[in-house]
């Protein structure tokens, strides 16, 4: 069984009789010598969907669960449900808007490549996205002539509604690459 410092986002833990999927991890390094590094983890309970927060020391042993990952394509929206199709056997996987509200900020209208669903014992757990996505800027203040790459940043609204900080020289209509986990601008899209 792994230690708490080996846990990554997207892993599933069996903790206190609950299946918890890791949504976010904050590492808190102590200032005193000899003190243990703390890992504050935010989870979603697989069965109830409730948000759970726990703290672990770096050397705490945790029980992880092995998941099945299947590549999917976004298919369609049916009311409050989002339907994804398995790329191999066309099995539909249905999520409610509440289950994937964080992920929806990164999924463009036509979907994106390399999306995966996580299942365990036939139970649908989560939707996992790739590390980056290319999105178009739909609204931002006009680009400033002569602005350099090291200039200040400004907020930009993307096609999915996500707002990120971008360099001043970018303008509406440009495609940019976003790091999904950190919700930050990485550069112009290819």
Swiss-Prot record:
BP GO terms, sorted: peptide biosynthetic process
GO cellular component term, pick one: cytosol
SMART domains (UniProt xref): EFP, Elong-fact-P_C
An example Gene Ontology molecular-function term: translation elongation factor activity
Family, similarity comment: Belongs to the elongation factor P family.
Protein name: Elongation factor P-like protein
Organism: Enterobacter sp. (strain 638)
């Amino acid at each position: 069984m792994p230690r708490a410092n080996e846990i990554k986002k997207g892993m599933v833990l069996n903790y206190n009789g609950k299946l918890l999927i890791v949504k976010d991890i904050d590492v808190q390094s102590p200032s005193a010598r000899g003190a243990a590094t703390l890992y504050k983890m935010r989870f979603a309970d697989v069965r109830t969907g409730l948000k759970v927060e726990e703290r672990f020391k770096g050397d705490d042993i945790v029980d992880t669960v092995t998941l099945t990952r299947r590549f999917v394509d976004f298919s369609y929206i049916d009311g409050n449900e989002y339907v994804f199709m398995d790329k191999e056997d066309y099995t539909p996987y249905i999520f409610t808007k509440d289950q994937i509200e964080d992920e929806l900020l990164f999924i463009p209208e036509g979907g994106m490549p390399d999306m995966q669903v996580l299942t365990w014992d036939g139970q649908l757990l989560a939707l996992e996205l790739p590390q980056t996505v290319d999105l178009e800027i739909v609204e931002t203040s006009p680009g400033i002539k002569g602005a350099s790459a090291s200039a200040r940043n400004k907020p930009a609204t993307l096609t999915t509604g996500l707002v990120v900080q971008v360099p001043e020289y970018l303008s509406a209509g440009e495609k940019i690459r976003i790091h999904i986990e950190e919700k930050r601008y990485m550069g112009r899209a290819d």
